[in-house]
Amino acid sequence: RHNPFSYKPEGFVNGIGHGSTFQDIHGNYWNIGTSTISKRHMFERRVSLYPVFFDKDGDAYAYTAWGDYPMIVPDKKVSSPQDLFPEWMLLSYKKEVETSSTLEGYPAANAVNEDIRTWWSAKTADKGEFMTVDLGQNSKIYAIQINFADQDAMISGKVDSTFYQYRIEDSQDGITWNMTVDKSENKVEAPNDYIQLDKPVNARYVRITNIYFPSGKFSISGLRVFGKVDKPLPA
């Protein structure tokens, strides 16, 4: 029934290979493996973690929807994917985007199309290059993920300068801005940085501004904003 046992054909990043399955201290099973980008090299990969469950016949299957989406890290035994769902929606999908500049062939829409294999690129890596996403309405934002794309990067191998420095701000009107995330002094390499906010913010606009980019041009394959909107649930 579940063949292959772990399978992810779609989503922001897909594929699941070279995996291993293990059990945590609470008795939950997990499958870890590599998801593929493979634009610059066939082994351009990311490591993804998926919860494993058992159907009524006792057959195991990996639930792969949470591999590129926020999930609750359990502190007890869980029995279904719903136990790990934080009830946040992807608010930034195909929303309007404004940028400081755009390199030909790498449009801003690529940063909100849920495809890690396409990206927006600014024309430079200068301090001050920015991208703003209009969520369309004031929303309650709980988490943000920034996936950098390294357009025209020339660094080879592991060096100490491969970190990203930036600021994220939020606004309800696009005029008055508040600091949401300050990574202007960051020295940790995190090309797929995920930030869960200490407390949610209410905003319509989210802006990321470059401070330092290690090589190439300031570029983003996914500026992903997670949260809720004040709307009734579908009937």
Give the location of each predicted region:
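Short consensus segments that form the blades of beta-propeller domains
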Residues: G11-F12, K39-F43, I155-D160
